[in-house]
Each structure stands twice: as structure tokens, then as C-alpha cells.
A protein has these predicted regions:
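Transmembrane beta-strands of outer-membrane beta-barrel proteins
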Residues: 25-29, 55-61, 91, 109-117, ...
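Bacterial Sec-dependent N-terminal signal peptides
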Residues: 1-17, 240-244
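Transmembrane beta-barrel domains of bacterial outer-membrane proteins
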Residues: 22-25, 30-34, 45-48, 146-147, ...
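Residue-level signature of outer-membrane beta-barrel architecture
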Residues: 48-50, 63, 97-99, 157-159, ...
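Transmembrane beta-strand segments that form the barrel wall of outer-membrane beta-barrel proteins
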Residues: 21-42, 56-64
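Outer-membrane beta-barrel "beta-signal"
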Residues: 92, 96, 230-244
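Extracellular/periplasm-exposed beta-strand and loop segments of Gram-negative cell-envelope proteins
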Residues: 30-34, 66-90, 120-148, 176-231, ...
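Short loop/turn motifs that connect adjacent beta-strands in outer-membrane beta-barrel proteins
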Residues: 15-24, 51-56, 100-110, 161-167
Length: 244
């Protein structure tokens, strides 16, 4: 009996030790945003496994920005420079339910579903040379702001390698988004001059910004310099992580 009691105590101690070593935390770095928006987009994340060991919450925060417009030039307008004070950030959060019946391994490894919320702000300053109808030229600065709120439901999968390294993929994340998009100018411009710059901005963003034609009413933006729309939203993300 004494031997059996000793074995039970040893087994219990080992289980407790395993429990203590269970890794509840993961830090992530988003590798999707830099591919879409450029190297200035750096978003970090943190995931915490809850006591149930089948649910977790995660938060992400970081810097982002509009993609580089590249060269824009025609007979009456020339894009001179992207100014230094580029602004943009991302904040998001989700609550994950790991599907134990679908997964061979404990969370946070395997299939998960859950709700999410994200907020993105993009700010962009540019300098332009515009040619007037009388042949004179003027230097104009423009500012573009985009605020995006999205709420939705996601489906994803997280791989774990060698107990420490994770690859987290939000594969499907449909939702509803509100998009507030505005442009402003440093000078008092004629309607024709504004129209030229707005058309150039619209064309550049349509080419460089994913989903631009869906989230922005382009005709309204080119006419008024602003647009506010509620429409479909989406979340897709790949992250590399380290568990501890």
C-alpha cells in the first residue's frame, strides 16, 4: 500500500508539473499587412488561453499606412512627394472557440471560430504641382483620411511547431464594415483643380488599395471629396507566433 501511495503521489506531482508548464500565452507578428500595405505596416498580437483551455482571446495593435501611390503625372497634374507625416494604426480583438471535437491537439492548436472587431485608421499627406488654365502652376498639399470599423465572425486554424512556434491563419472572416473617407486641401482651389486631384487620388487608391471599389463610392468621392459607406467587411490574416 505504501508503494502504491508513493506512485500515486508521484503521478499527481507530475501532472501538476505538466499543468504548470502549459503554455497559455502567444505573441504574434502579422506578416500579411506588410505584403499588402508595405514595410511600414507592423502589427503585433497577443493571445491568451483561458482556464477552460478551449477558449482564448487575442488583441492586435500596430502601425499601418496607405500603400505608396507611385508616379502620378499628366498634362495638368504632377505628384511631387509623399510627405513625411504618414499616419495609420490598427487595433483589433477576437474571442476564439477551439473546436475540440475537430482537433487532435489541445488549444491553441487547430480549428477555431469566433467573433472579432477591428478598427483601422489611414492618413496620407501628399504634395502636388497643378497647372492652371492660364499656364501658371501652384503647389498644393492634400490630406486623405480613412476610418474603418469592422465587426464579424471568423474561421481559422493555428499550427504549432516544436511546442514554441505557431503559425496562425484567419482563413475566413466575413463581417460588416463602416468606411468614412475624406480628402482635404491646404489651398483654396477651384472646383476644376479639386476635381483633378480627387480623380488622381481615386485612380491611385483603386489600383493600390485592396477592395477600394467595394468600400468607397468612387463617384461620390470624386464629386465631393468625401464618402461614408456601410457595406461588407472582411478579415484575413497570417501571423507568426512564439508561445510561452
Amino acid at each position: 500500500m505504501m508503494i502504491l501511495s508513493g506512485l500515486l503521489q508521484t503521478a499527481s506531482a507530475q501532472e501538476t508539473k505538466k499543468e504548470e508548464k502549459f503554455r497559455k500565452n502567444t505573441v504574434h507578428i502579422n506578416i500579411t499587412n506588410p505584403l499588402i500595405f508595405g514595410s511600414g505596416s507592423i502589427v503585433l498580437g497577443y493571445e491568451r488561453l483561458l482556464k477552460s483551455k478551449k477558449h482564448s482571446f487575442s488583441i492586435n495593435i500596430g502601425l499601418t499606412s496607405f500603400p505608396d501611390f507611385g508616379l502620378i503625372e499628366n498634362d495638368s497634374l504632377k505628384h511631387l512627394a509623399k510627405l513625411k507625416d504618414q499616419k495609420g494604426f490598427n487595433v483589433s480583438a477576437d474571442y476564439r472557440f477551439y473546436l475540440l471535437k475537430e482537433n487532435k491537439h489541445p488549444a491553441p492548436r487547430g480549428v477555431y471560430i469566433g467573433p472579432y472587431y477591428s478598427y483601422n485608421y489611414f492618413g496620407n499627406h501628399n504634395s502636388w504641382e497643378i497647372k492652371n488654365s492660364n499656364g501658371s502652376t501652384a503647389i498644393v498639399e492634400s490630406e486623405v483620411k480613412l476610418n474603418v470599423h469592422t465587426i464579424g465572425f471568423e474561421f481559422g486554424y493555428q499550427f504549432v511547431f516544436r511546442d514554441r512556434i505557431s503559425l496562425d491563419m484567419v482563413l475566413l472572416g466575413p463581417g460588416v464594415g463602416t468606411y468614412d473617407f475624406k480628402a482635404g486641401f491646404s489651398n483654396n482651389l477651384s472646383d476644376a483643380a479639386k476635381q483633378k486631384i480627387l480623380e488622381a487620388l481615386d485612380g491611385a487608391l483603386a489600383e493600390k488599395f485592396p477592395g477600394y471599389g467595394i468600400i468607397v463610392n468612387e463617384e461620390e468621392f470624386k464629386r465631393k471629396g468625401s464618402t461614408d459607406r456601410t457595406t461588407i467587411g472582411y478579415r484575413y490574416m497570417v501571423q507568426l507566433g512564439f508561445r510561452f
